[in-house]
């Protein structure tokens, strides 16, 4: 594939300062890292600057990042890594950006309409601001690329599968960062619940993704902030036939008007829903349905794994919402999941310092931990790995 460099031929690149750009569906984060060879795939990443930034326009956001780097007199980046949610059927490996890759990304935009157009706009702005630097596309789908057919193949006619219609899976960089952090403590059977404005559940066996809740697009799976999650296809057929909704209207419905926002009629923000639930029954129902959806999907992944050794909560809600963790685990009490509520409630005071907090009781039949997602660090690692060979003195 154009732009792909053999990661086994990296040579002596030494230390590289890398800017990781992470544009999500509801946030824009960035991190500046010094990646040290030869430990880039272990612990050799030094964060120099990490933050989120308002993004009125991609150009202003990138200019703001460049300004902060200059303000703090930090080392200028030598390469830029970009989180790309979906590369479509053609892009299944992290790769160095070139014109051919850009064209393939543009063609794949319909697979992730909430994410890809915004990421492409950020990429173009970054290419203008940091002209001449290599830019690397890091895909959320790569982590799930080797899922077994029983998980990957969708129950549709085979000729449609040839068009690339299959389960891709997402939040791969987040899942990979959890596996990386667990290191030697990685269990055989791991379930990761990445809960944020977008949410997914992934079953991991010996470090490999074997099933995940999102499918062809990031709209499927559990209930999310504004996304419906799994929905009877008959609902969409009914709306097309009886309400005369076209494709654009259905896309708006399932991606922007559903989920927590659609159920509550109040907000897609879980923090606001907790407040509203004190007086608004629909807000309370939205929270209940979200937690039930997550617990149900975790239970399904337990079946896939033939048991579970560790459940990890991560993402904005997973790391910060003790009530959601309590309700989800209450729905899993039948398999012996038991939380230490004191530890669970104290997570907010410790997670961002310690990154990894155990919250299960000693009697729990599986471990439960809250682990901070470090997508940006993974972007930096992959960007380092794809840099051309740099010899001393060059």
Features from the language model and the residues they span:
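Short glycine-aspartate micro-motif
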Residues: 16-21, 79-81, 136, 190-194
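Adenine-nucleotide phosphate-binding core of ATP-dependent small-molecule kinases
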Residues: 252, 259-263, 270-304
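Internal helix-turn-beta structural module
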Residues: 284, 288-309, 318-393
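Glycine-rich phosphate-binding loop of actin/hexokinase-like ATP-binding domains
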Residues: 143-242
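Catalytic phosphate/nucleotide-handling subdomain of diverse soluble enzymes
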Residues: 205, 211-246, 252, 315-354, ...
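Short glycine-rich, Thr/Ser-proximal phosphate-binding strand/loop in the N-terminal lobe
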Residues: 6-9, 18-59, 215
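Short beta-strand-loop/turn "lid" adjacent to the catalytic site in phosphate-handling enzymes
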Residues: 69-119, 133-136, 142-154
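Glycine-rich beta-strand-to-loop/alpha-helix junction loops that act as flexible
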Residues: 23-24, 82-87, 195-197, 308, ...
